[in-house]
C-alpha cells in the first residue's frame, strides 16, 4: 500500500526539527562567545566593521547553496546583530521619521537588534553621535539618478566623526493613499524633493495636474497623508512607510529608473581597520590657481590609485573656493595610499580623510 503525502513528509519534518534544535544550540553558543568577547573588550568598541565584513565574506565563500549568497549574508547579519546586542545594543541615528529609506539602510547594515533613533534632520543625526547620545549614524550621501546629498557632504567636511561603513540600497517608490486604492481625485502629492524628481516622468503621465509638494522625507509625507482628512492627497514613499502608517498602495515601483540606488555612509567615533576590500573618502581643496586641480589629482593617478568618485561643492568658508569629495579604492593605512596622501597634502590647501571602510557586502 502506497504511503500518503503526510507519511512521506514525516522523515523530512523530523529532520528539520532535529536541525532546528541544533541551530538553536549553536546560536546560543555563539552568543555566549560574543558575550565573552564583550567582557574582554570592557569599555572598548564592541562593533568592528572590518570583522563583520570578514565574517560575511567568509560565509559567502563557504556557501554551497541552495540558498543564494545574498540570503545567507542577510541571515548572518541578523545573527551578528543579535549577538552584538548580547554584548551591548547599539543606538543608530537616522533621518526620520520612522519608515524612511535611511532607517531601512540602518537596519540593513546593523540588523534589527540595533536600536534606531529617528532624527528630524541630517544635522541632528551628526549631533546625536558627536554628543554620544547615539553610537553611529547612517546618512544618505548620493543617489544614482539625482547625485549627491549636499547637506551630508557639507557635514562630512567639518565633522570629527569617521566614516566606518557604507550601505547600498535599491530604492523603490510607491504611490500611497489613505483608504483609497485609486489615482482618481488626487490633487496633491507629498514626498521628499529627490523622490519627486525620481518619479517625474510617471507623475507627468499619470498625475499631470497634481501639485507636487516637497517635505523633509518620504516617511514624513506618508505620515502627513495618514493624519490628513483631505481625501485628495497622496504620498510617494517606500513599502515600509505604507505598512507603518496604514496607507494603501495605489501604484508600486513608480521610479523612472529601475536601477535607482542610494548610497549611505555610516559614521562613528573610531577608525576602522583594513578588511582587504576597502574605500577611503576624502575632502580636499585646491589653491585658486590655473592647473591646481590637475596637480591635486596627480599623486593619485601616478600611484595607480583608482578613484570611484570625484565631485566638487562650493566651500562654505571661502568665496569661490571649492571642496572636492573623492572616493578611492583601498585603505588609508595602505602604504601606497599613505604615500599618495602625503604628496596630496603638499599640493592641497585642505585635506581631510573622512574615513576608510569596507566596501558594502549586501
UniProtKB/Swiss-Prot annotation:
Gene Ontology BP, a term: L-phenylalanine biosynthetic process
Pathway info: Amino-acid biosynthesis; L-phenylalanine biosynthesis; phenylpyruvate from prephenate: step 1/1; Metabolic intermediate biosynthesis; prephenate biosynthesis; prephenate from chorismate: step 1/1
Organism phylogeny: Bacteria, Pseudomonadati, Pseudomonadota, Betaproteobacteria, Neisseriales
Coiled-coil parts of chain: none
InterPro entries: ACT-like_dom_sf (IPR045865), ACT_dom (IPR002912), Chor_mutase/pphenate_deHydtase (IPR008242), Chorismate_II_sf (IPR036263), CM_dom_sf (IPR036979), CM_II_prokaryot (IPR002701), G/b/e-P-prot_chorismate_mutase (IPR010957), Preph_deHydtase (IPR001086)
The species this protein was found in: Neisseria gonorrhoeae (strain ATCC 700825 / FA 1090)
Entries under PROSITE patterns matching the protein: ACT, CHORISMATE_MUT_2, PREPHENATE_DEHYDR_1, PREPHENATE_DEHYDR_2, PREPHENATE_DEHYDR_3
Disulphide bonds in the chain: none
Function: Catalyzes the Claisen rearrangement of chorismate to prephenate and the decarboxylation/dehydration of prephenate to phenylpyruvate.
Protein known as: Bifunctional chorismate mutase/prephenate dehydratase
Reactions this protein catalyses: chorismate = prephenate; prephenate + H(+) = 3-phenylpyruvate + CO2 + H2O
Residue intervals of the Chorismate mutase domain: 3-91
Signal peptide: none
Entry EC number(s): 5.4.99.5, 4.2.1.51
Site (Essential for prephenate dehydratase activity): 262
Residue ranges occupied by any ACT domain in the UniProt entry: 281-356
One of the record's GO cellular component terms: cytoplasm
Keywords for this protein: Amino-acid biosynthesis, Aromatic amino acid biosynthesis, Cytoplasm, Isomerase, Lyase, Multifunctional enzyme, Phenylalanine biosynthesis
Pfam family for this entry, one: CM_2
Annotated substrate binding sites: 13, 30, 41, 52
GO molecular function, one term: chorismate mutase activity
Subcellular location: Cytoplasm
Residue ranges of domain Prephenate dehydratase in the record: 92-269
Amino acid at each position: 500500500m502506497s504511503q500518503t503525502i503526510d507519511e512521506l513528509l514525516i522523515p523530512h519534518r523530523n529532520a528539520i526539527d532535529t536541525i532546528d534544535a541544533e541551530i538553536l544550540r549553536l546560536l546560543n553558543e555563539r552568543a555566549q562567545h560574543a558575550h565573552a568577547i564583550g567582557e574582554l573588550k570592557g569599555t572598548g568598541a564592541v562593533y568592528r566593521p572590518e570583522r563583520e565584513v570578514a565574517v560575511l565574506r567568509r560565509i559567502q565563500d563557504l556557501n554551497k547553496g541552495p540558498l543564494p549568497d545574498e540570503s545567507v549574508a542577510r541571515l548572518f547579519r541578523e545573527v551578528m546583530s543579535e549577538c552584538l546586542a548580547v554584548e551591548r545594543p547599539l543606538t543608530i541615528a537616522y533621518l526620520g521619521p520612522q519608515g524612511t529609506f535611511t532607517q531601512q539602510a540602518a537596519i540593513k547594515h546593523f540588523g534589527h537588534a540595533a536600536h534606531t533613533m529617528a532624527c528630524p534632520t541630517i544635522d541632528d543625526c551628526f549631533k546625536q553621535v558627536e554628543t554620544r547620545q547615539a553610537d553611529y549614524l547612517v546618512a544618505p550621501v548620493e543617489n544614482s539618478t539625482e547625485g549627491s546629498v549636499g547637506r551630508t557632504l557639507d557635514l562630512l567636511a567639518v565633522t570629527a566623526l569617521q566614516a566606518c561603513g557604507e550601505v547600498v540600497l535599491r530604492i523603490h517608490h510607491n504611490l500611497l493613499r489613505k483608504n483609497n486604492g485609486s489615482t482618481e481625485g488626487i490633487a496633491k502629492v507629498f514626498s521628499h524633493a529627490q523622490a519627486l524628481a525620481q518619479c517625474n516622468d510617471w507623475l507627468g503621465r499619470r498625475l499631470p495636474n497634481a501639485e507636487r509638494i516637497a517635505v523633509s522625507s518620504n516617511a514624513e509625507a506618508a505620515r502627513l497623508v495618514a493624519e490628513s482628512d483631505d481625501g485628495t492627497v497622496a504620498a510617494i514613499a517606500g513599502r515600509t512607510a505604507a505598512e507603518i502608517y496604514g496607507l494603501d498602495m495605489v501604484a508600486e515601483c513608480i521610479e523612472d529608473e529601475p536601477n535607482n540606488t542610494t548610497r549611505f555612509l555610516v559614521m562613528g567615533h573610531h577608525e576602522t581597520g583594513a578588511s582587504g576590500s576597502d574605500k577611503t573618502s576624502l575632502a580636499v581643496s585646491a589653491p585658486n590657481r590655473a592647473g591646481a586641480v590637475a596637480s591635486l589629482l596627480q599623486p593619485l593617478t601616478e600611484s595607480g590609485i583608482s578613484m570611484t568618485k570625484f565631485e566638487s561643492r562650493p566651500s562654505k568658508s571661502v568665496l569661490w573656493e571649492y571642496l572636492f569629495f573623492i572616493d578611492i579604492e583601498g585603505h588609508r593605512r595602505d602604504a601606497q595610499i599613505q604615500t599618495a596622501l602625503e604628496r596630496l597634502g603638499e599640493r592641497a590647501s585642505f585635506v581631510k580623510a573622512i574615513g576608510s571602510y569596507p566596501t558594502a557586502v549586501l
